[in-house]
A protein has these predicted regions:
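Radical SAM [4Fe-4S] cluster-binding motif and immediate context
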Residues: 73-231
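A structural motif corresponding to the C-terminal lobe/cap of the Radical SAM core domain
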Residues: 148, 160-175, 179-338
C-alpha cells in the first residue's frame, strides 16, 4: 500500500508494472486510510474508499477519485502522535490546506477549497512545539497571505513566541495590502524568514503558468519585502516554464540582485504527477524525464544545453550570491557589468569548478 504526491496522477500503469503493490492512495489520507484498514482484507469493499486506486482480481483498473479532508480542523495534530519526531531542529506546520491560486505546475493548483485552522488551535500547537525547545517552524501554507486579515492575525500570534521561535513562510508579493505591509515593517528582527515565490518576471510566462496576481504588483511587493531591514526575503525563479528563455532568466537574476534579494534561488521545473502542466506537456512543447523528480529537459523556448546552463547558473548563485561572505561583492559585480554572470559562469565551467 503506497501513497503521497507520487500518486496524484493516473496510477494504472504503475499498478500494472508493480503487481506486488496492492493499491495506492491519491490525495489526503488521514481519514481514508483508517477507513481502508477496516476492509483491507475484503477487496470487494474497496470501491467504498475515496482516493483508492487498485486492480481487481481480473486485472480491471479501479479509480476512486481523489480524497480530500473537508474537516481539516478536526484532524488530530501530528505533534500529538507518539511517533512524532522531535529530534529535528525544526517542525513543519500547516495552518491552511489547499491553495487559492491556480498554478499549472503545482500539485496544489487545483486544491479547493482552502481549509483553515483557528488561531487558538494554532496557538495550542505552537505552545507544545515551544515546550519541546524547537527553534524553527516552517509554515507549509502555499500562500501565507492569501487572506490579509488572517495573515495579520497569524503574525501577531507568531510574535508571542519571539525570540524563541523563528518562522519560515512563503508569501505572495502581489497580495501585500498596505495594512499587512505596515504589520511586517513593525515586526522584530529575526522573527520571520520569507520566501517570495515570484517564479518569473515575465507576464506571458506567468499567464501561461496560470499564476494569479499582476506582475507589476508582485514586483512592487518584492521591492518592499527586500527593503525590509528586519527580515530576509528569498526570491525564487523556475527555469523550464513555458515561454521562458535563457536570456530572460539571466536578466531576471540581475533584476532580483538589484532588489537586494536575500537569496536568489533558481530551480528547474519538475512536471509532477497530477498537475495541469504535466497533462498538457505535449501541447505546451515540454519534454521531461519519465523518472522522478520528472525534471524538464527541453521546451520550445529553451534547449537541453540552455537548461544545463541554467542549472550551472543556479550553482553559481548558491556558491556566491547566496553565500553571505560573497554576496555584497557578487551583487555589485552583477549590477555594474551586464555580462558578468555570463563571463564568470564561462570561467567556472571551463575551470571545472561547476559542472
Amino acid at each position: 500500500v503506497l501513497g503521497g504526491p507520487e500518486f496524484l496522477g493516473d496510477n494504472e500503469e504503475f499498478l500494472r508494472k508493480n503487481p506486488f503493490v496492492d493499491c495506492v492512495f491519491r490525495g489526503e489520507g488521514e481519514e481514508v486510510f483508517p477507513q481502508w484498514l477496516t476492509c483491507w482484507n475484503h477487496p470487494e469493499q474497496w470501491h467504498t474508499v475515496p482516493g483508492l486506486c487498485y486492480l481487481t482480481p481480473n486485472k480491471e483498473y479501479k479509480d476512486n477519485g481523489i480524497a480530500r479532508v473537508l474537516n481539516f480542523a478536526g484532524l488530530v495534530p501530528p505533534e500529538q502522535s507518539r511517533f512524532f519526531n522531535w529530534s529535528k531542529p525544526f517542525v513543519q506546520l500547516e495552518t491552511t490546506r489547499g491553495c487559492f491560486n491556480t498554478c499549472a505546475f503545482c500539485v496544489s493548483g487545483g486544491e479547493k477549497p482552502v481549509r483553515t485552522l483557528s488561531i487558538e488551535s494554532i496557538r495550542e500547537r505552537l505552545q507544545l512545539i515551544h515546550a519541546h525547545g524547537i527553534k524553527n517552524v516552517r509554515v507549509l501554507d502555499r500562500t501565507f497571505n492569501y487572506n490579509p486579515r488572517r495573515a495579520k492575525e497569524l503574525l501577531r500570534l507568531f510574535l508571542e513566541f519571539h525570540p524563541d521561535i523563528r518562522f519560515h513562510l512563503e508569501i505572495h508579493p502581489a497580495l501585500l495590502s498596505e495594512e499587512l505591509k505596515e504589520e511586517l515593517s513593525l515586526l522584530p528582527k529575526g522573527l520571520l524568514h520569507l520566501e517570495a515565490g515570484i517564479q518569473s518576471l515575465r507576464e506571458p510566462v506567468l499567464e501561461k503558468s496560470r499564476r494569479m496576481g499582476k506582475l507589476s504588483d508582485a514586483l512592487d511587493g518584492l521591492r518592499f519585502l527586500c527593503a525590509l531591514p528586519n527580515m530576509e526575503t528569498h526570491a525564487d525563479l523556475i527555469a523550464g516554464l513555458p515561454l521562458y528563455h535563457l536570456h530572460e532568466i539571466f536578466e531576471d537574476v540581475r533584476t532580483l540582485a538589484g532588489y537586494a534579494a536575500g537569496e536568489i534561488q533558481l530551480e528547474s521545473l519538475k512536471l509532477l504527477p497530477g498537475t495541469e502542466m504535466r497533462r498538457r506537456a505535449e501541447e505546451l512543447g515540454i519534454k521531461y524525464s519519465p523518472l522522478p523528480p520528472y525534471e524538464v529537459l527541453q521546451t520550445h523556448e529553451i534547449s537541453v544545453s540552455e537548461l544545463q546552463t541554467a542549472r550551472q547558473l543556479s550553482r553559481l548563485l548558491d556558491g556566491f550570491y547566496n553565500t553571505p561572505a560573497w554576496q555584497a561583492l557578487t551583487r555589485e559585480l552583477i549590477l555594474n557589468d551586464e555580462q558578468f554572470l555570463h563571463r564568470f559562469l564561462a570561467y567556472l565551467t571551463k575551470a571545472n569548478l561547476i559542472d
